[in-house]
Regions:
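Conserved glycine-rich Rossmann-like NAD(P)H-binding loop of the short-chain dehydrogenase/reductase
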Residues: 28-39
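Short alpha-helices
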Residues: 123-142
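Active-site-lining helix/loop region of Rossmann-like oxidoreductase modules
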Residues: 9-10, 14-17, 142-217
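Canonical Rossmann dinucleotide-binding motif of NAD(H)/NADP(H)-dependent dehydrogenases/reductases
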Residues: 4-26
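NAD(P)H-binding glycine-rich loop region in Rossmannoid oxidoreductase-like domains
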Residues: 40-108
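General beta-strand structural signal in soluble alpha/beta enzymes
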Residues: 98, 122-124, 152
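Rossmann-fold NAD(P)-binding glycine/threonine-rich loop
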Residues: 100-122
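A structural signal for isolated positions on well-ordered beta-strands in alpha/beta enzyme cores
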Residues: 7, 31-33, 53, 151
């Protein structure tokens, strides 16, 4: 049975590297298309992979420059301001995963899906690190008969590895909002000013207090 490839947009960056590694461990024969505006970068990635092909993406074209070639799913690993990848996937009825929008940026994407909700699956992977902390916490919680509360704190060090797209995302989040969407006593509300700061206890037992200007959504 032939399987259409997954199109990875942003597959040449740091996040793309880890994504490909994870996919290969789980699905070693899964065909991949590594999409980039730079063919040389895409070919550099695919030269080290089996069942992978480099493709040049045109974000201004309705078909992303791919023509009629079959695609099984689309994953975009950077901020797609034009929503070109989502429109492409939605028009063809194939699943789409995006990971780089903030909670305040999802309305245009949801609006596209609402126009034809049964066209395809759309995953809004915008929770912290695409759910890495959430999934790990829920997995650990299964060992307990009862859980009274869960508190997750995540601190990104300025020396943590990440490509330019990651840096761009954090700078965008910090520049466009100074408030935090929080849930208190069952109600969601925007915390502003001093209330937007956050404190948590790190694994080395130190207490961290971060002002609003130093945190990301």
């Amino acid at each position: 049975m032939s399987i259409s490839p997954i199109l990875l947009l942003g597959g040449t960056g740091q996040i793309g590297h880890f994504t490909i590694q994870a996919l290969r461990r789980r699905y070693p024969d899964l065909p991949l298309l590594i999409g980039s505006r730079n063919r040389q970068k895409a070919e550099q990635v695919t030269s080290e992979l089996s069942h992978a092909e480099a493709v040049v993406i045109d974000p201004h074209a309705d078909d992303l420059g791919l023509g009629e070639r079959p695609i099984g799913a689309v994953a975009v690993l950077y901020s797609d301001e034009r929503l070109a990848s989502l429109r492409y996937a939605h028009a063809r009825g194939i699943p789409h995963l995006g990971i780089s929008s903030g909670v305040y940026e999802v309305a245009p994407e949801i609006a596209i899906h609402m126009q034809h909700p049964d066209a395809t699956a759309m995953v809004l992977g915008y929770e912290w690190l695409v759910g890495a902390t959430t999934i790990a916490t829920l997995t650990a919680a299964k060992a307990y008969a009862r859980v009274d509360g869960i508190r997750i704190g995540a601190l990104v060090d300025e020396e943590d590895r990440g490509g330019p797209a990651v840096t761009e995302d954090f700078e965008r989040f910090a520049s466009v909002t100074s408030s935090v969407l929080a849930r208190r006593e069952g109600a969601f509300a925007w915390r502003k000013g001093d209330e937007a700061g956050f404190s948590f206890r790190a694994i080395d037992a130190r207490n961290w207090r971060l002002p609003a200007s130093r945190r990301s959504t």
